[in-house]
Amino acid sequence: MENTHTHKLYLYNDKKHSFLYVIACVINVCKYEPLQAEQCTIIAHKNGKCCVKNGDYLEMLELKEKFEKLNLISEIESHESYMH
């Protein structure tokens, strides 16, 4: 069994930006289609956060920095997974 780490980037609801602004930012940063970005934005609004991407740490850090430049709150979480 092989142990691997994946990193998840969560976008948080901040209650100060409009839905349209956040959707546009998610489209820009994550390269999502509008419907997918809208779904992420709604999940973040309803649950307080939404996992918008997962992958290696450096990729998630780059996306996190892009969200920060747009004044959106995001966080990287590390998750262990096991492959058989």
Where do the protein language model's features map onto the residues?
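Terminal domain-initiation and capping elements
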Residues: 1-84
